[in-house]
Structure formats: C-alpha cells, structure tokens
C-alpha cells in the first residue's frame, strides 16, 4: 500500500519499512545526498563471454548505471549487462524514470535493449540519447534491430513513455546534473560522456583508440583534447581493451592499450581509473595481469592515479 501510494503521488524514490539498519545510512545518503554511485552491470567488449574463465569479472558487455543523489537513474549503454540491471529494477517494484545514453550503435552496446523489461511497463518513462549516424536518427538506430525480423517485438510494443534525442558534441543539463559529450576515435559516431554533479565528475569513455606515436592515426591534438575533457575527473571509466603487446597486431581496430590509457589518465590528472571493455579472448587471469601492467605503467609515469578493474556488480561511490 505504501509503495502504491508513493508512486501515485509522484515519488520515484522512497524508504520502505521495515528499515534495514545495515543499509539505512547508505539508503538515506542516496535519497538525500550529493554523491554519485556507478554500478557496473557489464564490463566486457565485443561479445558476451560465458564460461569458467570469466566468472570473477563477469562475461556481459557494456552497461554502467550512474545514480546522482535522488535524480533519475542514468544508464550508459545497453550491452548484455542491461539484462541483469533489468532484473534488479523489476525487483524494486516501483515506477522508473531514467535516461539511457548510448555511446554508439555497435552490437555490444545496444543488442540487449529489447530485453530491458522496464521499457514495456506502463507508467515508466525513459529518454534514449546518443549520436545520430548521418541521416539516421537515434530512434531509427534503436528500432532497426527491433524490426520484427531480427527480433519479434518492435518499439511500438513499448508500454513506457519513451523519448529519443539525437546528440552531437554538446552540453545538456537536468536535475542539477551536467552531461558533456565528445566524439571519440572509433569507427562511426561514438560519444564519450562526462557527468558532473555537486562538484564531482565521472567520465565514461568507450570505445576509443589513441594510437601509438608514429602510427598513421596518432593525433596529439586529439589526445590533448580528450585529456582536457577528462581533466580532474573523480572517476575515469575507459576502454582498455588490449595489453601493449596485444595492441601491436590490432592497431586500427578502434580500441586502446594499457600504455595509451596510462598516459591519458596521468595527463588528465584523474583521481581514479577503471579499466573497461575487456577483449573477449581475455580470461579473468588475463585481466588481473592487465591491471598489474597498468599499475606499473602509471608508476613509470610518476602518476598517483588509483587503478582498478571493476567486476560485474561492483559499485563505486564518490
């Protein structure tokens, strides 16, 4: 009864009885607070990788949910990780208002959107934002994979109110949150995002390639622009697909290596670096080794950046 009454009165977040003392302070901070929380629902790139070798970090593709205080949830990308987020949100039994930011429409960033159940629930409200590709709008990009042929349900079946918005390089503001966008170095139009809230900031930069010096695609001006975009961020979540050795045979594939990311994080003077979008051929042990390679690279640069490789379900708070 209390939940139904709260929803009818327009509440999107509330505390329910009985109060759980072990989580009360965290719940209250979230409800009233000036912090942001990022939850990782998928950290892999290219395609999901089930199996024993991916149990620790998880095998789902890109999806990160960011909560700023009591503002509507922001979801970044709709890879296979968004299915677990869907299950979590459905278990909350409350009306959902959220924004879904798409970096780009490659499959590992959009192909689980049709399985995001809250989109089909009347009373929920979503805005789906991302870069258009030529004359193709974000609405057309998202509906193309739900045309009744490749997937049996079309976007006309969405029960929630769903709005689409095309983005370029721009700044948007809502609920005391500022979101800035930047076009990244990746095939097609791929957007990076910087989220600012109450003096804190988090950058979501995937997919992206910076190239090594001497390679045809190396652009120092672009790298400096990206460092300026990320400068001083409390958290940088970024494409770190390859080790330096792996990158040598995969230059031009649209993804970054450990050394490239280490130099970016050090130049941008971010507080915390989170490795993301792991190559599907990398096992959990390989990611452990890549994390150690990153820590050593940062140390060689004299950087004090804290570095982690999040696992599915991990949360970071700032």
State where each predicted segment sits.
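Alpha4 helix (beta4-alpha4-beta5 surface) of REC/receiver domains from two-component response regulators
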Residues: 1-13
């Amino acid at each position: 009864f209390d939940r139904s009454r709260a929803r009818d009165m327009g509440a999107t977040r509330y505390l329910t009885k009985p109060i759980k003392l072990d989580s009360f302070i965290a719940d209250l901070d979230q409800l009233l607070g000036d912090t942001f929380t990022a939850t990782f629902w998928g950290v892999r790139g290219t395609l999901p990788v089930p199996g024993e070798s991916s149990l620790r970090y998880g095998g789902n593709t890109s999806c990160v949910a960011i909560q700023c205080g009591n503002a509507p949830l922001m979801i970044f990308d709709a890879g296979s990780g968004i299915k677990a987020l869907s299950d979590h949100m459905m278990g909350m039994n409350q009306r959902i208002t959220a924004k879904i930011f798409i970096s780009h429409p490659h499959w590992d960033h959009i192909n689980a959107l049709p399985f995001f159940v809250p989109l089909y629930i009347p009373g929920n409200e979503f805005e789906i934002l991302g870069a258009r590709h030529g004359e193709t709008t974000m609405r057309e990009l998202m509906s193309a994979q739900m045309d009744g042929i490749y997937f049996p349900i079309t976007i006309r079946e969405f029960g929630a109110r769903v709005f689409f918005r095309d983005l370029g390089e721009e700044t948007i503001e809502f609920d005391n949150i500022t979101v800035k966008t930047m076009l990244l170095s990746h095939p097609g139009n791929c957007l990076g995002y910087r989220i600012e809230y109450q003096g804190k900031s988090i950058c979501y930069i995937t997919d992206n390639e910076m190239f090594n010096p001497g390679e045809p695609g190396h652009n120092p001006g672009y790298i400096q622009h990206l460092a300026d975009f990320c400068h001083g961020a409390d958290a940088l979540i970024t494409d770190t697909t390859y080790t330096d050795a792996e990158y040598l045979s995969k230059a031009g594939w649209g993804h970054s290596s450990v050394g490239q990311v280490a130099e970016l994080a050090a130049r941008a003077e971010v507080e915390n670096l989170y490795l993301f979008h792991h190559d599907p051929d990398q096992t959990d042990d390989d990611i452990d080794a890549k994390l150690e390679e990153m820590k050593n690279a940062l140390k060689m640069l004299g950087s004090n950046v804290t570095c982690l490789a999040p696992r599915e379900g991990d949360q970071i708070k700032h």
